[in-house]
């Protein structure tokens, strides 16, 4: 699909409006298909590498249909509105869909004692392999949003049989955190969700965690520094960021596709210019951060893009 075909409706061009409407507005204005779609979804418990993850499976009518896996963004879940929207579009188009929930996300903080962090590549690779085994497939599609897009690119490096599509992926974690911290709106949003996750973790494992000291930390940067120092084995914040920084030659020879917007308020488009030529980068003028809201029904052009992308690669 030509990336130039995205044209938001009148009044929907502002990138911050796009991003906020996609995240908040779609939780309020629910599509007519949502209740029936989620009712038919099947939960799958995934136990890999000593961890307990979950996914939601949305089966196509054809047992032999191709599989597409979806990875949500940071502090999202398999039931995030944008994930459900893409899953519904793909399932309606004839694909099996597996919506993975990363550790601790989506109300799963009580399933594992250890805390999630964004450098847990091997755990997510193992989960993808588990899902592909469930569907008895040697190849599959994978789409990830934002931090999930970063995971999708890392998985493409280790599982070359995947047809990976990363929507507005974080390339430089440090710059992404700094960009979030530069906006009061985005910083408060992520701070609230992250603190909520830690509160769930403490409630599930009170003998292991006491996050009371984090309440005095008022920025995403200081909270990240606290988390890395107190709850991971990384030597420092720079070592943590480096573990999933995708700049330089990290993705050399990896075949994957990136869809992103020049007006993304969280991930600067310039981050994609240095990616190796094996990564097919498609940049639109507008779209915000993983939003691409095309009309006032809050439908996303990303769903159209995903349908065309995976139909070309998995149905040919």
Where are these regions (language model features)?
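Short beta-strand element of the alpha/beta-hydrolase
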Residues: 65-73
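The serine-hydrolase catalytic nucleophile loop
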Residues: 76-88, 269-270
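Catalytic nucleophile-loop/oxyanion-hole region of alpha/beta-hydrolase
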Residues: 87-89, 103-141
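Short beta-strand/loop motif that positions the catalytic acidic residue
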Residues: 252, 257-260, 264
């Amino acid at each position: 699909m030509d990336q130039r075909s995205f044209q938001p409706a009148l009044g929907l061009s502002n990138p911050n409006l796009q991003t906020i409407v996609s995240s908040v507005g779609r939780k309020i204005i629910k599509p007519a298909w949502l209740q029936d779609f989620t009712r038919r979804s099947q939960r799958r418990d995934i136990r890999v590498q000593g961890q307990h993850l979950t996914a939601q499976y949305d089966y196509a009518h054809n047992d032999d249909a191709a599989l597409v896996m979806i990875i949500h963004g940071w502090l999202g879940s398999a039931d995030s509105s944008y994930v459900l929207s893409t899953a519904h579009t793909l399932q309606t188009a004839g694909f099996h869909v597996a919506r993975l929930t990363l550790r601790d996300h989506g109300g799963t903080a009580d399933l594992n004692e250890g805390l999630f962090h964004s450098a847990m590549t091997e755990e997510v690779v193992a989960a993808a392999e588990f899902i592909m085994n469930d569907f008895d497939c040697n190849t599959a599609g994978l789409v990830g949003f934002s931090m999930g897009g970063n995971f999708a690119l890392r998985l493409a490096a280790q599982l070359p049989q995947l047809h990976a599509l990363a929507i507005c992926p974080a390339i430089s974690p440090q710059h992404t955190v700094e960009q979030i911290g530069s906006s009061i709106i985005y910083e408060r949003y992520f701070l609230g969700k992250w603190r909520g996750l830690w509160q769930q973790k403490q409630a599930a494992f009170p003998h292991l965690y006491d996050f009371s000291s984090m309440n005095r930390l008022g920025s995403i940067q200081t909270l990240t520094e606290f988390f890395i120092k107190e709850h991971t084995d990384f030597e420092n914040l720079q070592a943590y960021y480096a573990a999933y920084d995708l700049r330089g030659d990290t993705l050399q020879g990896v075949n994957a596709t990136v869809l992103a917007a020049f007006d993304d308020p969280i991930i600067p488009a310039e981050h994609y210019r240095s990616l190796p030529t094996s990564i097919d980068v498609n940049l639109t003028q507008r779209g915000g951060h993983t939003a691409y809201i095309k009309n006032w029904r809050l439908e996303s052009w990303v769903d159209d893009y995903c349908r065309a992308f995976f139909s070309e690669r998995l149905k040919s």
